[in-house]
């Protein structure tokens, strides 16, 4: 059991598009994961920084765009962060002070385009990389650009063993955002790079999401850490769109959560957490990855490279 680390998944919402308040919340929840559960890795939801504009229309119908929608986009874009930026510096500070590796969903602003991004922050190295969501889903395409093949990192990371202090645990981790998880070739790429800790920031609180996460854990023989937002009307600005405008209630649930940690053999180690903000944690035995690959390695002994060919088309690197 020397090959273990402690990981936490945070289920929470953006603080009403307030960057300072959201960063304070990130610090509070990271410290909770560390102090209560001994977390070495903490995964936060999709769009935790910048916010997920659930129910927003941005003044759009096919063939027309309203001025109020443009104003809403301005407000949303101003809540996004650049990379690098003082916000990234603050996350680096939180990571360093808590000694927790942080994976967090952000809305990234690059000139006039927004991206749904996951950033990786190391307690020793600071910001180390990012992944931009390849395909925003449905109306998300109105506000977010598409990532490309230059931001698909699978990171090598060493942790001190949680069960044998002084020993080192070497692992590989990645992040796949929300419905990207339904892209078989993207999953195949991450499996081919040896991901062992598969982070899945999301806002999908549907029951079927649990089946998706279990499937990926089994298919990839990896730990799946899915962090979903839990959000209520009070977590959004007062004039934000809601499902039923005639029955506004600050406690109405907008995003119900469902954060979960699943082992490479499909066992639920923590969660799913529903209808509440919180932190779930588990001790991950990285040897379970090899135990799983004994009978299934979809890009190794269970692949047929003589029948199928897989290739990543990697463009020039984007701005950091």
Swiss-Prot record:
Domain of life where this protein originates: Eukaryota
Catalytic activity annotation: a nitrile + 2 H2O = a carboxylate + NH4(+)
InterPro entries hit by this protein: C-N_Hydrolase (IPR003010), C-N_Hydrolase_sf (IPR036526), Nitrilases_CHs (IPR044149)
PROSITE patterns linked to this entry: CN_HYDROLASE
Keyword match Transcription: no
Family annotation (SUPFAM superfamilies): Carbon-nitrogen hydrolase (SSF56317)
Pfam families: CN_hydrolase
Keyword list, A-Z: Hydrolase
Keyword Hydrolase: yes
EC numbers: 3.5.5.1
Gene3D superfamilies (alphabetical): Carbon-nitrogen hydrolase
Active-site residues, record numbering mapped to chain: 46 (proton acceptor), 133, 178 (nucleophile)
One annotated GO molecular function: nitrilase activity
Annotated CN hydrolase domain residues: 5-286
Family: Belongs to the carbon-nitrogen hydrolase superfamily. Nitrilase family.
Stored PANTHER family: CN HYDROLASE DOMAIN-CONTAINING PROTEIN (PTHR46044:SF1), NITRILASE (PTHR46044)
Physiological role: Nitrilase that hydrolyzes preferentially fumaronitrile, while 3-phenylpropionitrile, beta-cyano-L-alanine and 4-cyanopyridine are transformed at much lower rates.
Official protein name in the record: Arylacetonitrilase
Species assigned in the record: Trametes versicolor (strain FP-101664)
